[in-house]
Amino acid sequence: MKKFLVCLLAVLTVGLFAQELPWQQNFDNALRLSKESGKPVFAFFTGSDWCGWCIRLDREILSKQEMKKYLCDNFILFKADFPQKNPPPENIMMKNHELMQKYGVRGFPTIVITDASGKALGMTGYMRGGPDAMMKVLDKYVKKASPK
């Protein structure tokens, strides 16, 4: 019985750490959720299957448990992915390209933080220092977005 409980706990723990982030694929939906929650939008522009820096950002920062918790607690997450394999439907790709133009995204990875109206509060990308460095930068935007 003791072994069973230890195994069960191990399986549940692995499942918790493997949890995916709740990315929105529709920016309008992300803005609606932002209005409802009061959280700013974390818009991640990426080439998930071909961009080396995007893959590195995901592996070194976004996939870390403390970063996942921070992002979920403080942001509505939107991902504009431009993969080479298995691209999203044409209408989503068109919208993502429009958003790139709107926010002046010129390369990947780019993170744009917006308020609930879609106004850009700031922009960043890959940075050294892991989750702590990223959270320090993002904290400034969370404070900007919070009502006074």
Give the location of each predicted region.
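Sec-dependent N-terminal signal peptides
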Residues: 4-14
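Sec/Tat signal peptide C-region and signal peptidase I cleavage site
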Residues: 14-20
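Thiol-based oxidoreductase modules, predominantly thioredoxin-like and allied folds used
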Residues: 21-24, 67-94
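A short beta-strand-turn-helix
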Residues: 23-41, 71
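Short active-site neighborhood of thiol/selenol oxidoreductases, capturing the structured segment around
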Residues: 37-51
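The canonical Cys-X-X-Cys-His
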Residues: 51-55, 111
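Typically the conserved alpha-helix immediately C-terminal to a functionally engaged Cys/Sec
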Residues: 54-70
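Non-catalytic, surface beta->alpha helical segment in thiol-disulfide oxidoreductase systems
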Residues: 98-147
